[in-house]
């Protein structure tokens, strides 16, 4: 994020801004002066290429601190004044309640239920403020030990009771479907084409549209991406030679002697697939 172009004599604010806006506190919890002072503290933090480990190999990169390029003057950041460097900035950021809340809301959004898009968080409260508060407290109490925080999350009632509250990302759709149908445990001809399917659904793997990443939840779905999802899943589930599909068919055949009405067959199949919930095309009024 351009910190290699962040020098004591010419401060580049890109990394400082992204650190505060996207990766720790969120918009509205710092000032423009904080962005500049944060960026000053990270001057001299850069990357250095290493010699390739093999002929014509890729150049790895490693962190390098160039003391002569570091601004060692006094800085004031979020109310703290001193000869601050990048490590001090991280400590100060992690001591802010806004950071704990930001991390907690991201965890809730990833594991429990879709939240509004991140840029709106400054003005839009969480869907479940109590859950986010519980996670934020766990972040602070554990001093950012994510194992402890996730234990609180996974043991909570709001996590256990969450169902049909998240729209899968394209990567989750593709990987989950391939796991369900089976036969893709090891690399095989055609697996590369399967990996492209997420891109057709709107998530070009390892190529997010910006440093912010992808917008999730309902923004995964539009008329084109929905068709891609349905067609991909239908094609995989129609291949009765796949071990996972065969297992679903066998389990259905073993239920009630394999005798179902059309409605019962669809319901039983959906239960074995997820469960998956669908609505009637024309629900009763």
Residue ranges and their predicted role:
Residues 1-124:
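Non-catalytic, conformational "gating/processing" segments within enzyme and secreted inhibitor domains
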Residues 96, 100, 104-142, 150-285:
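Flexible, low-complexity segments enriched for small/polar residues
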Residues 24-28, 54-57, 77-86, 147-152, ...:
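Short, Lys/Arg-enriched charge-dense amphipathic segments
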Residues 31, 50, 146-150, 161-162:
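Acidic/polar loop patches that form or flank catalytic/metal-binding clefts of enzymes
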């Amino acid at each position: 994020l351009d910190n290699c172009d962040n020098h004591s004599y010419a401060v580049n604010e890109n990394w400082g801004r992204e650190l505060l806006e996207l990766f720790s506190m969120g918009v509205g919890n710092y000032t423009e002066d904080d962005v500049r002072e944060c960026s000053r503290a990270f001057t001299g933090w850069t990357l250095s290429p290493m010699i390739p480990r093999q002929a014509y190999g890729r150049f790895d990169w490693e962190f390098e601190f160039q003391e002569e390029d570091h601004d060692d003057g006094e800085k004031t950041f979020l109310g703290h004044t001193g000869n601050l460097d990048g490590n001090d900035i991280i400590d100060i950021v992690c001591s802010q309640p806004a950071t704990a809340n930001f991390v907690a809301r991201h965890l809730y959004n990833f594991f429990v239920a879709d939240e509004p898009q991140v840029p709106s968080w400054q003005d839009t409260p969480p869907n479940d403020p109590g859950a986010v508060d519980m996670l934020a407290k766990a972040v602070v109490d554990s001093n950012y030990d994510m194992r402890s925080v996730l234990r609180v999350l996974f043991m909570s009632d709001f996590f256990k009771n969450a169902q049909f509250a998240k729209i899968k990302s394209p990567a989750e759709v593709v990987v989950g479907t391939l796991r369900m149908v089976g036969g893709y445990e090891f690399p095989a001809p055609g697996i590369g084409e399967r990996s492209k399917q997420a891109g057709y659904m709107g998530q070009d793997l390892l190529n997010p549209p910006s440093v912010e990443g992808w917008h999730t939840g309902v923004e995964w779905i539009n008329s084109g991406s929905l068709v891609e999802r349905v067609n991909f899943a239908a094609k995989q589930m129609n291949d009765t030679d796949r071990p996972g599909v065969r297992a679903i068919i066998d389990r259905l055949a073993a239920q009630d002697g394999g005798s179902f009405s059309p409605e019962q067959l669809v319901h039983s199949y959906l239960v074995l697939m997820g469960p998956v919930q669908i609505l009637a095309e024309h629900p009763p009024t």
